[in-house]
């Protein structure tokens, strides 16, 4: 088995310090226009950003999506993120816990999260390829109990696995059968998330047919995991690097993924993530059809700079979210979901070509 601990460290190093954010790709969020209301009818002080994340109330419709863990230095990053997430009352996901299940010495970098964040929703994380390799209920329960998780994310990353030097692109259909059986035995919900390439309506419908109702888009336009693996290939002289260059713009852009999932599964719980870099981006994702917005890379970069930097980052994000709510006349998150939007450009073309009637979608996104 390759040294997945060192691989995780390298992933974080490349993500934080190399040019992989939005490389050769777009979220299409620029094609979403929130309609300005010159007389909002509310005051800034009465705006309520609280919402629900499954059984728990959170202070804002924003979450930290899973990133890292597995070694002491990664545990320190997780600790900072968890402490700040607890202070701001927002959910936090951890990176893949495969390393902690297979290497006991890696567990502390994950368990620290619940120790310093006793009340917020924490989301465990395992990969779909591990289901093919034989993971079952025992491993899922271990991942959940390890951090006293409120939910568990199962990540899809076929594009990353294809170009990874030591990748395991194993996605046979029986993995979904196993996931369906496991979900019936768990006490917490499963969220299926992508890893930077988005969820299409075909994938959403397939997952839904196996009992999955919770999704995280992780669309194209944010952290480019094909680029990360390309850099790792280059460092090793691996011939896959040249091929990876041709796929840097592969995937479903975040805004398109939000529309596709919401349109095909109207009752889904949906995290809109992938290139969310501001409170305005978060508001657009929610108005477009997500329940909450998720972000990872900007949180990681701020956490590396320190706790104060991350606190300032979240203050900025939440202020921008509230500013958008003010300027759209949205007193609360439910009102933001129903706010007026205009869909332009490539996103409109994408939706229409994919057979999505935007007049019908207008009612779907507003949950009417």
Swiss-Prot record:
It is found in: Cytoplasm. GO terms for cellular component: cytoplasm. Its main location: cytoplasm. FMN binds at residues 65-68, 96, 125, 193, 218, 223, 275-277, 296-297. It is an enzyme of class 5 (isomerase). It catalyses: isopentenyl diphosphate = dimethylallyl diphosphate. It comes from the Archaea. One of its GO terms (molecular function) is FMN binding. CDD domains: IDI-2_FMN (cd02811). One of its GO terms (biological process) is isoprenoid biosynthetic process. Mg(2+) binds at residue 161. Substrate binds at residues 7-8, 96-98, 160. InterPro entries: Aldolase_TIM, FMN-dep_DH, IPdP_isomerase. The keyword Zinc-finger does not apply. Keywords: Cytoplasm, Flavoprotein, FMN, Isomerase, Isoprene biosynthesis, Magnesium, Metal-binding, NADP. Involved in the biosynthesis of isoprenoids. Catalyzes the 1,3-allylic rearrangement of the homoallylic substrate isopentenyl (IPP) to its allylic isomer, dimethylallyl diphosphate (DMAPP). PANTHER family: ISOPENTENYL-DIPHOSPHATE DELTA-ISOMERASE (PTHR43665:SF1). NCBIfam families: IPP_isom_2. Belongs to the IPP isomerase type 2 family. This is Isopentenyl-diphosphate delta-isomerase. It comes from Saccharolobus solfataricus (strain ATCC 35092 / DSM 1617 / JCM 11322 / P2) (Sulfolobus solfataricus). The gene is fni.
């Amino acid at each position: 088995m390759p040294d997945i601990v060192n691989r995780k460290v390298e992933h974080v190093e490349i993500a934080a310090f190399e040019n992989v954010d939005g490389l050769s790709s777009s979220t299409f969020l620029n094609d979403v226009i929130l309609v300005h209301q010159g007389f909002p009818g509310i005051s800034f002080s009465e705006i309520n950003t609280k919402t629900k994340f499954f059984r728990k109330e959170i202070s804002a419709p924003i979450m930290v999506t899973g990133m890292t863990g597995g070694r002491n230095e990664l545990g320190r990053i997780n600790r900072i993120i968890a402490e700040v997430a607890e202070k701001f009352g927002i959910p936090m996901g951890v990176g893949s816990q495969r390393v902690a299940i297979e290497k006991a010495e890696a567990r502390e970098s994950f368990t620290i999260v619940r120790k310093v964040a006793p009340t917020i929703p924490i989301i465990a994380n395992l990969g779909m390829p591990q289901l093919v390799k034989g993971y079952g209920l025992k491993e899922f329960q271990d991942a959940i109990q390890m951090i006293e998780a409120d939910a568990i994310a199962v990540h899809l990353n076929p594009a990353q696995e294809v170009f990874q030097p030591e990748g395991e692109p194993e996605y046979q259909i029986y993995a979904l059968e196993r996931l369906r059986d496991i979900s019936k035995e768990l006490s917490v919900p499963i969220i299926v998330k992508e890893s930077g390439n988005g969820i299409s309506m075909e994938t959403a419908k397939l997952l839904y047919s196996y009992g999955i109702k919770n999704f995280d888009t992780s669309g194209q336009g944010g952290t480019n995991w094909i680029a990360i693996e390309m850099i790792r290939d280059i460092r090793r002289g691996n011939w896959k690097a040249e091929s990876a260059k041709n796929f840097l713009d592969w995937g479903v852009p975040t805004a398109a993924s939000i529309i596709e999932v919401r349109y095909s599964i109207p009752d889904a719980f949906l995290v809109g993530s992938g290139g969310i870099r501001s409170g305005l981006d978060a508001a657009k994702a929610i108005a477009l059809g997500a329940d909450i917005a998720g972000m990872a890379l900007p949180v990681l970069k701020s956490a590396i700079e320190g706790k104060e930097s991350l606190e300032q980052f979240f203050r900025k994000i939440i202020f921008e979210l509230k500013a958008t709510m003010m300027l759209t006349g949205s007193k609360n998150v439910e009102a933001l979901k129903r706010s007026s939007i205009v869909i332009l450009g490539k996103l409109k073309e994408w939706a229409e070509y994919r057979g999505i009637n935007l007049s019908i979608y207008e009612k779907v996104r507003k949950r009417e």
